Amino acid sequence: MADSKISPGMQQYLDIKAQYPDAFLLFRMGDFYELFYDDAVKAAQLLEIGLTSRNKNAENPIPMAGVPHHSAQQYIDILIELGYKVAIAEQMEDPKKAVGVVKREVVQVITPGTVVDSAKPNSSNNFLIAIDFDGSHYGLSYMDLVTGEFFATTLSDFMSVCGEILNLKAKEVVIGFEITAEQEEQLQKQFRLLLSYEQEIYTDDTLINPNLSQVEKNVAGKLLQYVHQTQMRELSHLQELIHYDIKDYLQMSYATKSSLDLIENARTKKKHGSLYWLLDETKTAMGMRLLKTWIDRPLISKQAISERQNIVETFLESFIERSDLADSLKGVYDIERLSSRVSFGKVNPKDLLQLGHTLSQVPYIKAVLEAINSPHLSKVIATIDPIPELESLIHSAIDPDAPATISEGSIIKTGFDQRLDHYRKVMKEGTGWIADIEMKERQASGINNLKIDYNKKDGYYFHVTNSNLSLVPDHFFRKATLKNSERYGTAELAKIEGQMLEAREESAQLEYDIFMRIREKVETYIDRLQTLAKAIATVDVLQGLAYVAEKNHYVRPEFASQKVITIQNGRHAVVEKVMGVQEYIPNTIQFNQNTSIQLITGPNMSGKSTYMRQLALTVIMAQMGSYVAADYAKLPIFDAIFTRIGAADDLISGQSTFMVEMMEANQAIQRASHDSLIIFDELGRGTATYDGMALAQSIIEHIHNRIGAITLFATHYHELTSLSEELGHLKNVHVAILERDGEVTFLHKIAEGPADKSYGIHVAKIAGLPGSLLSRADNILKQLESHSKDFIIKDNSQQSEENEPLNLLTEETSSQDIINRLKEVDVMNMTPMEAMTVLFDLKKKIK
């Protein structure tokens, strides 16, 4: 109900705000977007802008803050980045012509998942996700409102849903079902997502194939409904929904991708030091986005991989053409982003000029590809359409010096429209006519300083100072009186002014109408532009991969039909790039059909983790269609990679390192297949020694006996190396060490067999620990290695109660049980692992 104390304008604000309670409402008032009440208070703090009040002298002044409309986007970006929604209420009529309160409406709601017009555009996708549940399966759909891409899949459980949300790096998820409080908390707090809710289904058979599963049609329809509700317009650039299955790609969890530094360095959160950084030699924004997608989702189809490899090889063999191609690609703007701006009605003259320039480059790109004359390029060449009629329209219509905004005029080229040319001629000649009138009246009147000026209020007028008022001719009529001068008009000047003002108004309106027609025409080409964008992006990524392969001396990997790996002198591609080729020590990796697990021992800092990551990156590069860092590589095609490396542990969620270890290990145990790759680095280090060792052995046995996946398992539990006697497909390898005159050198080379020492004290020495501490540690180590029975080794230099040997038999209640258990033990026929298990059980009895 309206409040009698509130003005009609503020009541209008409150009515609109009530429709968008979860968003900041930017309320257009003249040249500013204003915020009121709680929105103003909160925005002033978040945006660091001034907080004032409306009706300051009233009993309850209204908090108010505002931002200029021309710079509003930067403030909107800040709010969106912080996870808020922003509703934009525009003036829907000219305030000068309005009767009563100016009509205002919300024209768009901008959310973290629907950003298309950021002041800081980047080359990454921004996916908006929707999820739904039909009682047995989850539907997940996502789209990028910039590129128009639209996908849907079916998932079996909520864990898979969470995994896909993390992989897509979404900021906003639309919920289409009755979500549980636990699920909501996980998405909202643990993953820090903005959750929106939508139950209605938008039906569009042109975008959503009726033959899709019902849960996918429902979730895609709810996503479309949310998009239409927030964007409030038909979006012509949205592409037909594509069904996908996560099993169609090499599956990797978000933790795996993070620990392998695929898109960004896990430690620095920067591009530098990632696989993306290494491989990114793209020249276009579309290519950069596609490269990220390829790294994120390597293929499992040998044919599809080979098609990419064939083009990379073709480019490698065509150095001159590839160089010309790269130069041409540098002149290509972001076609996908430009197409979305057309669809959203936000395209400006500069955007069209960029599109026109891009289209002018396409014939050169196509000609270079055709000159290579390779059958491997025929498919992509067929999709490269220069769209000459659109390029011609833009270049014939848009002035190359056109401003960025439509309202400034001077957009349309002279010669494009006869009426517009006529109005411009009138305005141009009118300026000359006014100059002639000025000269004529100056001579006739004898007023030597007589001149004609212009302002919006009085139009054109003669400026006459008070000292010359006696010379003013009779046909002059007064328009305005100032302190030291008068302003006059004449019938002749008024006539010319009328013609010029009419020409100016008609010209401005006509130019606007012409631009709108051109924009509508461009919109009809969006499908062809998107096809062109995909083709150029593909060519861009592949030429970049060829450049990287040539520069770094990579080889084309072969794919084996059997589970065998031969990587000769393989390198960790990213580490090699950072260190330099001369510094990096390559390693050969081999798995035959009789080996599925390599148990890797050796000291920290010796290169175990790099060796394991090297294999994972080689697999990813190979299956995305890239060449790999090796002298020779032959691999099977893997269906998934599971890792537990630990570089990207996130303890903020409240989970311990050990819990994270076990969760990631469990994911591999539950989901890995015979065709997967498993990489475990120091599994079990997050708990007590015997706990960790027991779990490590059990997991190794499970992988060996039940899964059969190729596995690299690095461990500091040297006792586990004895498992090779029991597990026929397990092979011990270690990092070679050169020990001479008490000094240790890490060779960073993998050798067969288990490590004989851990060299932990040497690593501590490198880290700079005090000499006295190292000497004490060395003394303890020697006593342990001599099988001392004491649990704590005495320090002869410092006697204290704390150095006394630990007596396990301090309680009579437990001593007899322990004695009985020891009597049962057959020491001579026990393995080291069984002996440790017994000791572990005994230790638990005395706790």
From Swiss-Prot:
Binding site for ATP: G602, P603, N604, M605, S606, G607, K608, S609
Domain of life assignment: Bacteria
Family annotation (PROSITE patterns): DNA_MISMATCH_REPAIR_2 (PS00486)
Record keywords: ATP-binding, DNA damage, DNA repair, DNA-binding, Nucleotide-binding
Role noted for this protein: This protein is involved in the repair of mismatches in DNA. It is possible that it carries out the mismatch recognition step. This protein has a weak ATPase activity.
Classification via HAMAP family: MutS
The name this protein goes by in its record: DNA mismatch repair protein MutS
Matches recorded under PANTHER family: DNA MISMATCH REPAIR PROTEIN MSH1, MITOCHONDRIAL, DNA MISMATCH REPAIR PROTEIN MUTS FAMILY MEMBER
Naturally occurring in which organism (per UniProt): Streptococcus uberis (strain ATCC BAA-854 / 0140J)
A Pfam family matched in the record: MutS_V
Gene3D superfamilies: 1.10.1420.10, DNA repair protein MutS, domain I, MutS, connector domain, P-loop containing nucleotide triphosphate hydrolases
